[in-house]
Amino acid sequence: MAVYNYDVVVLGSGPAGEGAAMNAAKAGRKVAMVDSRRQVGGNCTHLGTIPSKALRHSVRQIMQFNTNPMFRAIGEPRWFSFPDVLKSAEKVISKQVASRTGYYARNRVDVFFGTGSFADEQTIEVVCANGVVEKLVAKHIIIATGSRPYRPADIDFHHPRIYDSDTILSLGHTPRKLIVYGAGVIGCEYASIFSGLGVLVELVDNRGQLLSFLDSEISQALSYHFSNNNITVRHNEEYDRVEGVDNGVILHLKSGKKIKADALLWCNGRTGNTDQLGLENIGVKVNSRGQIEVDENYRTCVQNIYGAGDVIGWPSLASAAHDQGRSAAGSIVDNGSWRFVNDVPTGIYTIPEISSIGKNEQELTQAKVPYEVGKAFFKSMARAQIAGEPQGMLKILFHRETLEVLGVHCFGYQASEIVHIGQAIMNQPGELNTLKYFVNTTFNYPTMAEAYRVAAYDGLNRLF
């Protein structure tokens, strides 16, 4: 058994692991990374964010071809199979792996491929694919092993027509009808993707409103677009049992209803990848979803062990995970890079997409903050008209007395890009965070960014 000594060992090579390893390495520390795959990137690159967003992009291109009258001169609408569309995602995955492999090589991060677990508080044993065991001894260890779909024990996920958000990427055909159980972010994104491929989608939600953490107007807009695009949303429903049959799946609901489809996609919750880490050997406990508790420095109950990313729970976003990993390493190397990541933009890649940051109307009303609203509808924006993307809006919430920007909510074309302009202004100190920035700044024309100017004028016109 070979023994290696490091300053920092990072378990996992997803966004959190990458952020941690790169920050520690650039601070001059000797760093090792352990990943259970034979390639870096984690679930984000191989099963989650990257393939699903690449898949969504391809589906949007198909939708644009099929709905734009200009293309009728070329031919009639075309429908592509799910496996064909998935091929484009696979190309992106390989490029991402190559990029990240290069990052670690240039920064002298040693990467070990195998299953890593704690032997004690400073030792990780890595069982490689060939059976060889390596021992890594480190001053500090960062757990960034991510998460996987939560799988209830009473559902047969080995049935060929029952999938979760990881295994759906192995789907070898295009179903005519699909049940998506769970209307969280992942469920809504996949409902959009399959609807764009012409699949009839039954989206089962155990809550009374889609993505209830969003501004209610944005949530209602999403519901409207879903119902307009062959997605039937069933609210306040819970599964009783899932029955896999030869020609499909039957979902039995506690309300007594039954739904039959060609396949079922389970998207109801996630579980931290902690069950094979040997945490019992170091006294670190997890909650019912396998998640680790950390303090504001991302330190666990063991002084030299940290956690970051999906494995610690909220907000379970790739963007936040990277910053959490970077901050965990910042706590170790003390290079001024630490911050507690608690105010991140939400990016939801439905069709149309959604993004937001800051407070929503419900929260401001409950807190009795005197706010006002400014809106810009994309159907009136020149750039949206040119792009053939009239659906959507930008909504700015601001303090009616100080004009401080309190929240930005966007639904539609390029929403996840547009939100960052508002984020930049909201992060300015004191009086520099003001709605007046948008009316006193020249925006390129035509752009989607100028929606901020339109929304700001709309908001100012409401004041008296």
Swiss-Prot record:
Protein name in UniProt: Soluble pyridine nucleotide transhydrogenase
Gene Ontology molecular function: any one: dihydrolipoyl dehydrogenase (NADH) activity
Alphabetic keyword roster: Cytoplasm, FAD, Flavoprotein, NAD, NADP, Oxidoreductase
Entry's cofactor comment: Binds 1 FAD per subunit.
Biological role: Conversion of NADPH, generated by peripheral catabolic pathways, to NADH, which can enter the respiratory chain for energy generation.
Gene that this polypeptide is encoded by: sthA
InterPro entries per UniProt: Class-I_Pyr_Nuc-Dis_Oxidored, FAD/NAD-bd_sf, FAD/NAD-binding_dom, FAD/NAD-linked_Rdtase_dimer_sf, Pyr_nuc-diS_OxRdtase, Pyr_nucl-diS_OxRdtase_dimer, STH_gammaproteobact
Required cofactor(s): FAD
Catalyzed reactions: NAD(+) + NADPH = NADH + NADP(+)
Lineage of the species this protein comes from: Bacteria, Pseudomonadati, Pseudomonadota, Gammaproteobacteria, Pseudomonadales
The organism of origin for this protein: Pseudomonas fluorescens (strain Pf0-1)
Enzyme Commission number(s) of this protein: 1.6.1.1
The keyword Flavoprotein is annotated on this UniProt entry: yes
Gene Ontology cellular component terms for the protein in this record: cytosol
Example of a GO biological process term: NADP metabolic process
Family the UniProt entry places it in: Belongs to the class-I pyridine nucleotide-disulfide oxidoreductase family.
Compartment annotation: Cytoplasm
Chain positions recorded as FAD binding sites: D35, S36, R37, R38, Q39, V40, G41, G42, N43, C44
Entry keyword annotation includes Magnesium: no
